[in-house]
From Swiss-Prot:
Phosphoprotein listed as a keyword: yes
Stretches the record annotates as Disordered: 1-132
Gene3D superfamilies hit by this protein: 1.10.132.10, DNA Topoisomerase I, domain 2, Topoisomerase I, Chain A, domain 3, Yeast DNA topoisomerase - domain 1
Protein's recorded name: DNA topoisomerase 1
One Gene Ontology term of the molecular function aspect: DNA binding
Biased composition (Acidic residues): 42-51
Quaternary structure note: Monomer.
The keyword Transcription regulation is assigned to this record: no
UniProt-listed Pfam families: Topo_C_assoc, Topoisom_I, Topoisom_I_N
Catalytic activity entry: ATP-independent breakage of single-stranded DNA, followed by passage and rejoining
Domain Topo IB-type catalytic: 364-769
Ranges of Basic and acidic residues composition bias in the record: 91-132
């Protein structure tokens, strides 16, 4: 919900004290049977007599694609050109002379013409093959495809046992482990110096699973019995893995490139499938390798073994007439299905949560694009019902029935503060919380109407907000926390997401609590973009766009931890800006060397000429020289790596020496400049006008770099990508780019441009969410 919408809802909520205590608490002395009877009667559907809601519930539902919401989001395909129109013939002038051509020239012209025609045909064919699903109407949503062919999945390589002298040690003695157990021990050894390996829960879960695998594989080969984790020493294994890492780093760029090309060639057949005769990209076509589960936050299953997945565990899905991909030698597929009502190509059950993993089409595929489109259209459809929903939950905040009152408060919190619905978690799942699963200790009340939320949300990210709520909502939360409730008790003890979502679907087909987050994120983004003036540089417009995006990310609690390299990145950016400032000062000094009188004529222009101290300039000089030396040293190594790979003669050391001599000349120039205060005039600096033009360019670069640095610092703890990809309708970003003349490449990466191609090609600058 936007800030304006929140204030509107809060204003409309009544603050009367009457009937604050629900009926169930005022009638405690009634018999249990009569209470149950009254409760059933009171909790029956309350909207049968409500004219506005009955109209909504009786309204015949239509397919989302064909239902108009404010304006058509997808324009009709452009009209075809008339087949009868012919190009006008150019009248031959009397002065035109016909040039004779030789037979050879005629053949070359014919060949060139043929090549051009082939190129045009190729382009036309490519355009014809491109499937623009957003220009079509999907008549049957249950059928996902008619034909589907693919090449299966790629399995991780089999385990390679460690060299015979690399062992796990127990009580100081080397242990001969079977390969299956050695692999699992290696998973822990590789993480020995990480935070995971120091986590007692991680250690316990790993050790239990390690002992299980050890038992399954027959136990240690040299008879040493392993009982306690604390007596295990993984150091030798860890050192070996570190050595392997270092050896990989020592590979030349050409060797790395060769490995990458070979891998890409091997993966090529798995990257694409054939869907209804079209070539579509596959997303995750690799089966996850075995490893230790990390999990986010304080996950109770962290450290458990993710077991190796075999072909026998995998179900493939493809057309009946499609060739079945061959299973790896010595194996067979678990099952072959031909289900065209699902989108997945392969699936298997993983052992950590006993849940299914799927191989699906890539984000830029037609099926994924249609799924995204429907999600955002569903959220967009909510705006036709949101006023009625808000009116009803405002009224129900004073309902005599506790369940109705809890539903009203929950929808208020989901709508105003973008809380997730939440649900019960089992003991072996992370203790993450949403609205319906809030407990007594997660909510602190500060009169008159301040609420402090403090809990772990999705992915164990802390949700901490101190907010003001409507007085009636505050009173209800006070009631929900009354004795005998205490820490550990559910706040919404009569409510769960299924009850809430079933209730919401009385308003709109398919409406769930999740749709509110998408709606409020997109609505907030629309409102924020409307406030941006269409002026300034592209960098300034992007800064304002990111500020709008950040507002949404904060609303949705999309946080991230500050990266380890953030401080270093900021320092580098500041150094770069300082160097640009120094270059600008040098230019202005050069101007005065050409015309000293300008200092009196334009004193303001030269105000900053002494902003940098000699120490500042010396530091800048050293940075530039060090960077130049490193650049040439790396260039020398890179060139020789390439020549060595291609078996060419290596560059001599004298070449590096020659490059470094140029750097030394620059160093001497800087030293002289620092001493005299005069700049060595370049040949291009032969006029004041030319140098002033360079100053102007430097000022633009300084401004752009400063804006980018500010943006980076402001977004260091906020994840803009999560809301941009999953919650903000991509058409809003497209409209922003078209309306404000910002290149789409500045907002969407190449991957996102492919994912949201439907949005880029379907709206103009006047589209509204």
């Amino acid at each position: 919900m936007t800030i304006a919408d929140a204030s509107k809802v809060n204003h409309e909520l009544s603050s009367d004290d009457d009937d604050d205590v629900p009926l169930s608490q005022t009638l405690k002395k009634r018999k249990v049977a009569s209470m149950n009877s009254a409760s059933l009667q009171d909790e029956a559907e309350p909207y049968d007599s409500d004219e506005a809601i009955s109209k909504i519930s009786k309204k015949k539902t239509k397919k989302i694609k064909t239902e108009p919401v404010q304006s058509s989001s997808l324009p009709s395909p452009p009209a075809k050109k008339s087949a009868t129109s012919k190009p006008k013939k150019i009248k031959k002038e009397d002065g035109d002379v016909k040039v004779k051509t030789t037979k050879k020239e005629e053949q070359e012209n014919e060949k060139k013409k043929r090549e051009e025609e082939e190129e045009e045909d190729k382009k036309a064919k490519e355009e014809e093959e491109e499937y623009k699903w957003w220009e079509k109407e999907n008549e049957d949503d249950t059928i996902k495809w008619v034909t589907l062919k693919h090449n299966g999945v790629i399995f991780p390589p089999p385990y390679q046992p460690l060299p015979s002298h690399i062992k796990l040690y127990y009580d100081g003695k080397p242990v001969d482990l079977p390969p299956q157990a050695e692999e699992v021990a290696g998973f822990f050894a590789a993480l020995l110096e990480s935070d995971h390996a120091k986590n007692p829960v991680f250690q316990k879960n790993f050790f239990n699973d390690f002992l299980q695998v050890l038992k399954e594989s027959g136990g240690p080969l040299n008879g040493i019995e392993i009982k306690e984790f604390s007596r295990c020493d993984f150091t030798k294994m860890f050192d070996y893995f570190q050595l392997q890492k270092e050896q990989k780093k020592q590979l030349t760029s050409q060797e790395k490139k060769q490995i990458r090309l070979e891998r890409e060639k091997f993966e090529e057949d798995y990257k694409f499938c054939e869907l209804d005769g079209r070539r579509e990209q596959v997303g995750n076509f690799k089966v996850e390798p075995p490893d230790l589960f990390r999990g986010r936050g304080a996950h109770p299953k962290t450290g458990k073994l993710k077991r190796r997945v075999n072909p026998e565990d995998i179900v493939l899905n493809l057309s009946k007439d499609a060739p079945v991909p061959p299973a790896p030698e010595g194996h067979k597929w678990g099952e072959i299905r031909h289900d065209n009502t699902v989108q997945w190509l392969a699936m298997w059950r993983e052992n950590i949560f006993n849940s299914f993993k799927y191989v699906r089409l890539a984000a830029n595929s037609s099926l994924k694009g249609q799924s995204d489109y429907k999600k955002f259209e569903k959220a967009r459809q909510l705006k036709s019902y949101i006023d009625a929903i808000r009116r009803d939950y405002t009224r129900n905040l004073k309902s005599k029935v506790m369940l109705e009152r809890q539903k009203a408060v929950a929808i208020y919190l989901i709508d105003v503060f973008a809380l997730r619905a939440g649900g019960e978690k089992s003991e072996d799942e992370a203790d993450t919380v949403g609205c319906c699963s809030l407990r007594y200790e997660h909510v602190t009340l500060k009169p008159p109407n301040t609420v402090i939320f403090d809990f772990l949300g999705k992915d164990s990210i802390r949700f901490y907000q101190e907010v003001e709520v409507d007085k009636q909502v505050f009173k209800n939360l006070t009631i929900f926390k009354r004795p005998p409730k205490q820490p550990g008790h559910q706040l919404f003890d009569r409510l769960d997401p299924s009850i809430l979502n079933k209730y919401l679907q009385n308003y709109m087909p398919g409406l769930t609590a999740k749709v509110f987050r998408t709606y409020n994120a997109s609505k907030t983004m629309q409102d924020q973009l409307d406030l941006i003036p269409n002026k300034g540089s592209v960098a300034e417009k992007i800064l304002k766009y990111n500020a709008a995006n950040r507002t949404v990310a904060i609303l949705c609690n999309h946080q991230r931890t500050v990266t380890k390299g953030h401080a270093q990145t900021v320092e580098k950016a500041n150094n770069r800006i300082q160097e640009l400032e120094w270059q600008k000062i040098r230019c202005k000094r050069a101007i005065l060397q050409l015309d000293k009188d300008l200092l009196k004529k334009e004193p303001k222009y030269f105000e900053e000429i002494d902003d940098l101290t000699k120490e500042d300039e010396a530091t800048i000089h050293k940075r530039i020289i060090d960077r130049e030396i490193e650049k040439y040293q790396r260039k020398f190594v890179r060139e020789n790596d390439k020549r060595k790979f291609e078996k060419e003669e290596l560059l001599p050391e004298s070449q590096l020496k020659e490059w470094l001599e140029k750097v030394d000349e620059k160093k001497q120039e800087f030293e002289k400049e620092l001493k005299t205060g005069e700049v060595e005039l370049k040949s291009s600096w032969n006029s004041v006008e030319k140098i002033k033009a360079q100053v102007e360019k430097l000022e633009q670069r300084i401004q752009t770099s400063s804006i980018q640095l500010k943006d980076k610092e402001e977004n260091s703890q906020v994840s803009l990508g999560t809301s941009k990809i999953n919650y903000i309708d991509p058409r809003l970003s497209v409209v922003f780019c078209k309306k404000y003349d910002v290149p789409i490449e500045k907002i969407f990466t190449k991957t996102l441009r492919e994912k949201f191609k439907w949005a880029i090609e379907s709206v103009d600058e006047n589209w509204r969410f």
